[in-house]
Amino acid sequence: MIFSISKRKLICGFSLVALTIAGIVGGVYLVTKNNQQTTPQTNHFNVADPVNKVPNWRKLGPETQRELRDLLYPLDDTGYFIYKYGAISRYLQSQKELDELVDYRTVLPSTQKHFKYDSFNQSVLESKLRKWLMKAIKQHPYFQHFEFDPVLKAQYNINIPAQKITVNAVWFYKKDNDLTTGKPIRYWDQFEIKLKQ
């Protein structure tokens, strides 16, 4: 016979091939397992996801998108409060009181007088604005889990030449503190209301 192989050499050859294949498969498994453990988990969730379905929803805050969560409140740098952005402006569009918020005819410039401020009642504007903001806060899925109504502080600026109202809203709930620092949490949103032309 030309190819005479002993049983011993044959068994050693098959064992060597089997060990090589097992080593390759085991190495690939370990590398894949280590990569899965070291890859950071991203917290990008769909806005349409129900808030209570998101893991650690209470710790994340009102917004599940990282870009919105990382927004800083521009009007306070004391460090006493933890500010979390809550995009309530997207819920304002569903309010039917949008057209009742301001009597646009009394705000727009007039040819007879420079500006008609005499018939513009700012207390009516403020009360409607607060009511409107409270409804928008209650429509946000995150804030529906709170038992009590929030304490709302709304500031606005009427800009006649630009025909817009800029609104800064800050609200908070009693005994709502950050889980890690223990500091009181304040929620905020800033947006503009365009007046009718």
Curated annotation (Swiss-Prot):
Transmembrane keyword on record: yes
Keywords, comma-separated and alphabetical: Membrane, Transmembrane, Transmembrane helix
Primary site of residence: membrane
Membrane topology category: Single-pass membrane protein
Phylogenetic lineage: Bacteria, Bacillati, Mycoplasmatota, Mycoplasmoidales, Mycoplasmoidaceae
InterPro entries attached to this UniProt entry: DUF5452 (IPR035219)
Transmembrane region(s): 11-31
Origin species: Mycoplasma pneumoniae (strain ATCC 29342 / M129 / Subtype 1) (Mycoplasmoides pneumoniae)
Keyword Transmembrane: yes
GO terms for cellular component: membrane
Subcellular location per the Swiss-Prot or TrEMBL entry: Membrane
Protein name: Uncharacterized protein MG286 homolog
